[in-house]
Amino acid sequence: MNMKLKTAALLAAVALFATSASAETVLRLGHVWPESEIHAAAAKQFADDVAAATNGEVKIEIHGNSTLGSDRELLEGIKFSSNDIWVGGAGVLSTASEAARIFTLPFMIRDVNHYNAVYGGPVGGEITKRIRDESGYEVVAYWLRGPRWLTTKVPVEKPEDLSGLKIRVPDSPVTVQSWNQLGASATPMNFGEVFNALQQGVIDGQENPLSLILSSKFSEVVKYLVRTEHAYEPVVVVMDAGRLAAMPEDQRKAIVDAANGVAKAYASDEVQKGEQTFVKQLQDAGMTLIEPDKKPFQERVGTDFVHKTFAPVADLYDSVAAVEAPNGQ
């Protein structure tokens, strides 16, 4: 990050919080999801818990459904105080940090146990530190998000079936390059535009966790649900590192504890429970389930691809692969 920006952000943070401990601090939290989405509910829980822990001294105002902008705009807005907290898919951080490219590398995380071992352990700590050093953003918490699935208007059973298909992806360099490598025409787009783009034929498909596919009613505009489970991208709670550090210690602790407390547990529980029912609900809504052999997809975007295309995070990728999860998974 530009040193002038770092200094300006820190000075602004110090000025903002150089008030009496009893003064109310209002923080604006932005996300792109509808209220019914699991992580939107988790964000509300987080805000409620911060208010309770600080006796109302810190109030978090939630602005969901892209009302403050796209994920990238929300992330960048943290530096200019148009919003203070962003909750969203971690891959968007890759626009500001090389280390954040790790989040959306395809087929890197093996399962939920592996996910928890990675982001709850030393490797997760190293990822957080590198993002802070490179960008000035502080990842306050990692929330579980189910694996990403592909939804399309035509059947996809092998990589060759992706040829010529415009697949909406988040604004993440890793995701764009990975889907292009798989054979698709990756199309970055603000999430709030996806439903209409599918409806109007601007794109041929999209990829997201089941919870978001369901809550966004994509079953109304695409027919095929493809079990690729190609990425376990975390949802992250992000603030400006300097601003968080400048807050009174009790308020800073309340934010960190709340982000890693009930809200995080709620998201994890709901995602894992939902995985058992979301597929059936989507099938009941008219979608056709396709369960392809994942190996041909994995081979196109495996270790050789990562080391060649994303060399700055190859060491982190190897560290993640070496993490052993409980129960030998």
What are these regions (language model features)?
Residues N2, T19, A325-Q329:
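Generic C-terminal helix-cap and adjacent flexible tail
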Residues T7, A12, E24-Y115, P122-Q329:
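N-terminal secretory/targeting leader peptides
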Residues L16-A23:
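Sec/Tat signal peptide C-region and signal peptidase I cleavage site
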Residues M1-T7:
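Positively charged n-region of N-terminal signal peptides that target proteins for export
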